From Swiss-Prot:
Transmembrane stretches, start-end: none
GO CC, any one term: cytosol
Gene Ontology molecular function: any one: ribosomal small subunit binding
Subcellular location: Cytoplasm
Alphabetically ordered keywords of this record: Cytoplasm, Ribosome biogenesis
This protein's record includes keyword Cytoplasm: yes
Self-association state and partner proteins as the record states: Monomer. Binds 30S ribosomal subunits, but not 50S ribosomal subunits or 70S ribosomes.
Protein name in the entry: Ribosome-binding factor A
Highest taxon in the source lineage: Bacteria
Length: 132
């Protein structure tokens, strides 16, 4: 007897639904003062739906304290998701601060700095600055 595999598309659909539901539930149901304005960036599910990595950004507040508070509230959020989702297994939630935005800003700053240094070096050498 062959086991039925879950399709990658279904995994993405469930992850997207969890992302939408968590965004709403955190805003309306979680009353922890350590949690400021939070945006759920993405949700990654294990193939068996047992665990979900939930990546968030925090517009206000300390990201570490926010992560701690969200992980503390994960059991409550799990129960609320169970009432909303119509799937057999609702995953255990693991919250992680998403540093993608900060890393992108830092990379942009480094690129600008490198370009301005290169232009300055070209000007000092008497060669025209090149645009790539």
């Amino acid at each position: 007897m062959s086991r039925k595999r879950t399709s990658p598309n279904r995994n993405v659909q469930i992850a997207d639904q969890i992302q939408r539901d968590l965004s709403e539930l955190i805003m309306r149901e979680v009353k922890d003062p350590r949690i400021g304005i939070v945006t759920i960036q993405s949700v990654e599910l294990t193939p068996d739906y047992a665990h979900a990595k939930v990546y968030f950004t925090a517009l206000t507040g300390d990201p570490e304290k926010t992560q701690e508070a969200l992980n503390h509230a994960s059991g409550h959020l799990h129960n609320l998701l169970f009432k909303r989702l119509h799937i057999h297994t609702v995953p255990t939630l693991h919250f992680h601060y998403d540093q993608t935005i900060e890393k992108a800003v830092e990379m942009s700053r480094l690129i600008k700095e490198a370009n301005s240094t290169r232009a300055k070096d070209d000007d000092e050498a008497g060669a025209p600055a090149q645009d790539d």
